[in-house]
């Protein structure tokens, strides 16, 4: 039967499980055979143990990704989730390869580190897509809130004005890391080829030291903007339980980075001095980092499985082909649009021109909600007409809404706005745009 038939959801999961079992039957004996042929030392033992953790990590992550593809009912939310879930297998396999072949570690590790910027970006997309569906005009919601001061260590800086300014700067803070990280990665590769990189060696003569500082500042600022964004909109984000999701992303990104720095400090201090089968002590530091990541990714896979579960997206009547779901996972048109829009907004700021508003009335509806723009089409009323899923509690948010099938926000039941509710005050303050307030259906 063709892939577009509705029964593909029945056979795709058993097929993936079967392929994985076949891979184990073929791969494990080969690894054992190579292990017996090689001289078994610390390096080989570390590689073999790390491989065991990789074999346990991959099925957990791929199963979560597969379940989201099978129940791909809310593209705006599930597309960034799938991209985030790919982080664990990419980190795991990448680190295992780098551990086995130290000479190419610099190349595979830089690809891994580049993906972490992509993950932070997609987590921001996930939060924004949920919020812009729930609160079509997020800027008005922010303007109605009390002024948020900066968090430590920037508490002495002037606060960002609530509304478009705060949104713009939080998005810019996250997006800058997705640009800085690939640029520093390319510089690192060039420095490695010219022999001036010196990975793991803190020295003013090595490019690695300066690139670590640049990446660290960029990463910390991106995470700071995420924390500030969550702090301001904590109440609106509560229905999707963002704390566990945020910790999953933050722990993987921060722990992997700082443990690499900590290991490099131990090497510089002479605590790690034995080279075993490695050529130099810096290679030992890189190998130790890769080994630890392989172990940590197993724990991260378990955490991701529960934090980014597919269950809230299960619907009784699901449509769509497996081919469409698979292609949607690789679609990066939203990233190109966001970066392009951000460059234009920065250019307008530099030239002293007004920035484009994030919330226009005539934005075209499509599958995703752009990171730097949103729609005024209100999916809440559409969500209220969808039968609740027995497995989920925020079903309906993130549905692909079209003007032909979605009523406008002016049809929102008046019961949603009580006389003493914040929404009623917001509507009173903005009588010209009553459909752009945040509807707290979860309260």
From Swiss-Prot:
It comes from Xenopus tropicalis (Western clawed frog). Belongs to the TMEM184 family. InterPro entries: Ostalpha/TMEM184C (IPR005178). Its main location: membrane. The chain crosses the membrane at residues 15-35, 46-66, 84-104, 182-202, 210-230, 252-272, 284-304. Residues 369-378 have a biased composition (Polar residues). It is found in: Membrane. Coiled coil: none annotated. It is a multi-pass membrane protein. GO terms for cellular component: membrane. Keywords: Membrane, Transmembrane, Transmembrane helix. Residues 369-422 are annotated as: Disordered. This is Transmembrane protein 184C.
């Amino acid at each position: 039967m063709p892939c577009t038939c509705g029964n593909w959801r029945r056979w795709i999961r058993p097929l993936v499980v079967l392929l994985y079992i076949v891979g184990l039957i073929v791969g494990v004996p080969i690894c054992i055979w190579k292990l017996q042929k090689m001289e078994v030392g610390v390096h080989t033992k570390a590689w073999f143990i790390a491989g065991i953790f990789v074999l346990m990590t991959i099925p957990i992550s791929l199963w979560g990704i597969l379940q989201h593809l099978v129940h791909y009912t809310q593209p705006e939310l599930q597309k960034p989730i799938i991209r985030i879930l790919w982080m664990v297998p990419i980190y795991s396999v990448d680190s295992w390869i780098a551990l086995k072949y130290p000479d190419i570690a610099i190349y595979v590790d830089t690809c891994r580190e580049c993906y972490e910027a992509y993950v932070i970006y997609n987590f921001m997309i996930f939060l924004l897509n949920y919020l812009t569906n729930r609160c079509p005009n997020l800027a008005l919601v922010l303007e109605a809130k009390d002024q948020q001061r900066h968090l430590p260590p920037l508490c002495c800086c002037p606060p960002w004005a609530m509304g478009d300014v705060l949104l713009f700067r939080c998005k810019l803070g996250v997006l800058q890391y997705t640009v800085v990280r690939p640029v520093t990665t390319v510089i690192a590769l060039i420095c490695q080829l010219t022999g001036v990189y010196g990975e793991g060696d803190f020295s003013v003569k090595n490019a690695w030291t300066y690139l670590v500082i640049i990446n660290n500042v960029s990463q910390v600022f991106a995470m700071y903007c995420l924390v500030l964004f969550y702090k301001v909109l904590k109440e609106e984000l509560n229905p999707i339980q963002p704390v566990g999701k945020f910790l999953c992303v933050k722990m993987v990104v921060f722990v992997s980075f700082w443990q690499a720095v900590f290991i490099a400090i131990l090497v510089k201090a002479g605590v790690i001095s034995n080279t075993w089968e490695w050529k130099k002590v810096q290679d030992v530091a890189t190998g130790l980092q890769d080994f630890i990541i392989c172990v940590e990714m197993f724990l991260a896979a378990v955490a991701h499985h529960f934090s980014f579960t597919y269950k809230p997206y299960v619907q009784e009547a699901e449509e769509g082909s497996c081919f469409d779901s698979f292609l949607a996972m690789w679609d990066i048109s939203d990233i190109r649009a966001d970066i392009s829009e951000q460059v234009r907004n920065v250019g307008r700021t530099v030239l002293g021109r007004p920035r484009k508003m994030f919330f226009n009335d005539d934005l075209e509806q499509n599958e995703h909600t752009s990171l730097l723009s949103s729609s005024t089409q209100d999916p809440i009323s559409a969500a209220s007409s969808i039968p609740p899923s027995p497995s989920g509690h925020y079903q309906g948010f993130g549905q692909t809404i079209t003007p032909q099938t979605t009523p406008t926000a002016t049809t929102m039941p008046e019961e949603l706005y009580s006389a003493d509710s914040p929404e009623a005050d917001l509507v009173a303050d903005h009588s010209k745009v009553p459909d752009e307030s945040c509807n707290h259906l979860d309260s």
